[in-house]
Amino acid sequence: MTCRGSPLAPLLLFSLHGVAASLEVSESPGSVQVARGQTAVLPCTFTTSAALINLNVIWMVIPLSNANQPEQVILYQGGQMFDGAPRFHGRVGFTGTMPATNVSIFINNTQLSDTGTYQCLVNNLPDRGGRNIGVTGLTVLVPPSAPHCQIQGSQDIGSDVILLCSSEEGIPRPTYLWEKLDNTLKLPPTATQDQVQGTVTIRNISALSSGLYQCVASNAIGTSTCLLDLQVISPQPRSIGLIAGAIGTGAVIIIFCIALILGAFFYWRSKNKEEEEEEIPNEIREDDLPPKCSSSAKAFHMEISSSENNTLTSSNTYNSRYWSSNPKAHRNTESFGHFGDLRQSFSLHSGNASVPAIYANGSHLAPAPHKTLVVTANRGSSLPAVSRSNGSVSRKARPPPVPSLHTHSYTVSQATLERIGAVPVMVPAQSRAGSLV
């Protein structure tokens, strides 16, 4: 069977030509994993029936850290290569000589930031149609960095402690394994381990918990370790000196407090005593009245009251008529003046009466001259004197004393006062404040 002359021949030839002229990008083998710092190869191949004169290849990357900002890795167009993003300069190139149907690229000295999704876009005119995009994932693996180990909690015996282990870097995320570096390489029975978080909790630690512990951080491409020394602290007995010092300090504090309380008490007591002494009034005592004189003699009674000066004076005054020629002196007047318990006087006047002077003891004496016995208790004021003469009482104002050339004052002796019947009395004293004591 031949197709010559058949009207279907041109259509069949066009259909075959269209199939042969289509471009197809091969599927990628999947994700590529590479350790940091090594070279990664990203494959991309295609098929085409057209010449590679107009070949156009673009490699793009969608970074894992920022999927919204795709970046150009490398470009081949018109028989020339062009660099993409600045961070790929000098590290990226095609694995084969261009132009070719194998447009795979390599990335030297891979970095963690190179991780992402890479796309290969191929165009070769006049071929059209078909799938012209290839997708390849790149994962840059990072081994665990040196982990940091530490102890959390008190290391005193009986306490709970947590051993921590963590690495700052590691892709994929590392796992952590704790072990005790002894003969058994096993953790204490009371320990609980979390390999994902990298922690070990040891409860109720004892002396057997002490030792060297190791943490191993590992992932798909590497491992790293750290060591930790756990030393459980046993309770130390307190020294005798420390106990004695504490007791001595407490005793000093107690003695000081007692002394302070006693001092405050005595101060309060003395202060209250002074206030009580100031509030108690002075006691005033009065003397009893003198004993009564016998009926056969005239009584001579003298009272003295308190005054500002509290003075007791006696005077014996006489005048020139004492030496008169009259041999007889009669007692014709008896005067007794009581001046508000302040002044008393007893006087004998010479006269024509023949009655001799009689004293309290009943003896008769010779006619006496004119004598006056004055007992005064001075006050600031002068009041009228009360006198008694011949049974009549009269109040006269005492004239002021007039100095006389014939008047003399002298002190009466104790014997003279006793002879005339004077009675001794106690004179109250006076304080500076004016109150009697």
From Swiss-Prot:
One of its GO terms (cellular component) is plasma membrane. It is a single-pass type I membrane protein. The chain crosses the membrane at residues 242-262. It is found in: Cell membrane. Residues 382-405 are annotated as: Disordered. Residues 144-234 form the Ig-like C2-type domain. Residues 23-136 form the Ig-like V-type domain. Glycans are attached at residue 102. PROSITE patterns: IG_LIKE. Keywords: Cell adhesion, Cell membrane, Disulfide bond, Glycoprotein, Growth regulation, Immunoglobulin domain, Membrane, Methylation, Receptor, Repeat, Signal, Transmembrane, Transmembrane helix. Functions as a cell adhesion molecule through homophilic interaction. Stimulates cell growth. This is Immunoglobulin superfamily member 11. It comes from Bos taurus. The lineage of its organism: Eukaryota, Metazoa, Chordata, Craniata, Vertebrata. The gene is IGSF11.
